[in-house]
C-alpha cells in the first residue's frame, strides 16, 4: 500500500476539531478524491500528509513506514514520496518559473542554489522541459509574480512533477 491514513485526528489550540476520524488508503495508480465543504479539513489533512502539521491521533503510513514516529531523515525521504500542490501554490513570487521548478526538488526549503544558479545544465534542461510540458516554455525566465493564477498553478504542477513523487496531492 502506497499510503494509509488510519483514524487521523487533528485539533487546533483554539479547540477547533479539523479532523475526527480520517481513514483511507491509496495504492499505486489510484485516483482518490477527498471531498467536503470549505473548512471541512481537507487542507489540514494534506498538510499532515506532507509533514508540515502533526496529527493528534491516528497514523499515517507511507509504503508501510509510520510517518509520525519516523526519525527526521526517514521523514524527509517519506516526504519526497508525496508531492503537494496547494491552493496558494506555495511559489516564490520574485523568483523565475525555472527557479521555482528547481526549488521544488530541494530539501528543507534550501532555495539558495536555485536563485544563484548552482544547478547543473542537465537539471536546468529538465526544469525547462517540464515548463514546456505545462505550456510555459516562453515563461522560463519570467518572475512568478507576473503570471496569471492558471500559469502559477502550472508552475506548481511542473515543480511537483520534477520531484518525481509516487503520489501527487492536489488541494
Which residue stretches match the model-derived regions?
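Helix-to-loop junction immediately C-terminal to a conserved catalytic motif
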Residues: 50
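Conserved ABC ATPase signature
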Residues: 143-147, 151
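The feature captures the beta-strand-to-loop junction immediately N-terminal to the Walker
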Residues: 35-37
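Catalytic Walker B motif of ABC-type/P-loop ATPase nucleotide-binding domains
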Residues: 168-171
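Conserved ABC ATPase "signature" region
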Residues: 66, 113-138
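A short, flexible loop at the N-terminus of ABC-type nucleotide-binding domains that lies
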Residues: 1-5, 10-21, 71-72
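ABC ATPase NBD Q-loop/coupling interface
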Residues: 59-77, 118-120
Amino acid at each position: 500500500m502506497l499510503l494509509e491514513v488510519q483514524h487521523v485526528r487533528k485539533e487546533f489550540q483554539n479547540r477547533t476539531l479539523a479532523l475526527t476520524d480520517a481513514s483511507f488508503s491509496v495504492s499505486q495508480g489510484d485516483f482518490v478524491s477527498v471531498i467536503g465543504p470549505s473548512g471541512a479539513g481537507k487542507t489540514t489533512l494534506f498538510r499532515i500528509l506532507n509533514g508540515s502539521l502533526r496529527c493528534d491521533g491516528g497514523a499515517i503510513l507511507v509504503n508501510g513506514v509510520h510517518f509520525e514516529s519516523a526519525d527526521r531523515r526517514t521523514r524527509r525521504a517519506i516526504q519526497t514520496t508525496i508531492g503537494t500542490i496547494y491552493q496558494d501554490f506555495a511559489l516564490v513570487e520574485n523568483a523565475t518559473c525555472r527557479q521555482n521548478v528547481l526549488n521544488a526538488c530541494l530539501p528543507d526549503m534550501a532555495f539558495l542554489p536555485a536563485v544563484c544558479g548552482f544547478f547543473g545544465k542537465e537539471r536546468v534542461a529538465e526544469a525547462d522541459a517540464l515548463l514546456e510540458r505545462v505550456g510555459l516554455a516562453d515563461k522560463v525566465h519570467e518572475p512568478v509574480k507576473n503570471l496569471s493564477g492558471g500559469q502559477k498553478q502550472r508552475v506548481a504542477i511542473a515543480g511537483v512533477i520534477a520531484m518525481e513523487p509516487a503520489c501527487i496531492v492536489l488541494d
